[in-house]
Amino acid sequence: MLKELSRLFSLSLALIFVFSCVPKRVEIPVYEGIDVRDVLSAKNNISAIDTTFSIVFEKNDSEMRGEGVLNISRNGDLSLRVYSFGFLALAVTSEKGMIKSNPRIDRNKGKLLTQGLRDCLFWWDIQNFDVDEKDGTYLLKNFSREIWLDKKTILPIKQRVSLDDGRELHISYEDMEKMGDVWYPSKIRIELSQYSVTLRIREILFTGAV
């Protein structure tokens, strides 16, 4: 009898330890009843983003996988390094719209890795937009961008960006995570013509975050 009680007591302690070690799920805050413009403007203090991620480039039936390190400013200036099997496979910089890369990349890939990264990460930075509500979403729209947001969480679902040449960037978002006080999508896919890029964010830092 004593052995049985001792065994049950030990099992109870083990279960308490296990469940105490399980991370608590943090619920995404709900912004129902709050103006979407106020929620977005609260993020305007964010001036730069540093992030590391896994990255998959796809073109037609081919793909390349790697690990990315990115520093990007709200104005679009960026420094991107992509490593494959531990070796530097691609380096891209953009400053005041001047793009440099090693090795050279074509126009489509350049758009994906500059304007695509800027608009997908700084998704809330949209000016002079109209708001429509439909089926539990907000649609934010101006002359060059359309962003669909979840109406409760004010987090992005997808985005469409019109380029100067008439083509469009298509961006989709999944798997919301939290860093500090900022919620962000940890999986992002950007598509342009026959190209696509999928990011799985590992670490992220928001400079000037709320």
Regions inferred by a protein language model and the residue ranges of each:
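Acidic/charged, solvent-exposed loop-and-adjacent secondary-structure segments enriched in E/D, K/R, S/T
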Residues: 98-130
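N-terminal leader/targeting segments and the immediate start of mature chains
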Residues: 20-69, 76-77
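Membrane-embedded segments
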Residues: 64, 81, 85-89, 106
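Extended lipid/amphipathic-ligand handling interfaces
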Residues: 68-72, 92-97, 172-178, 203-204
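Sec-dependent bacterial lipoprotein signal peptides
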Residues: 1-21
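Flexible beta-edge/linker motif
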Residues: 87-93, 101
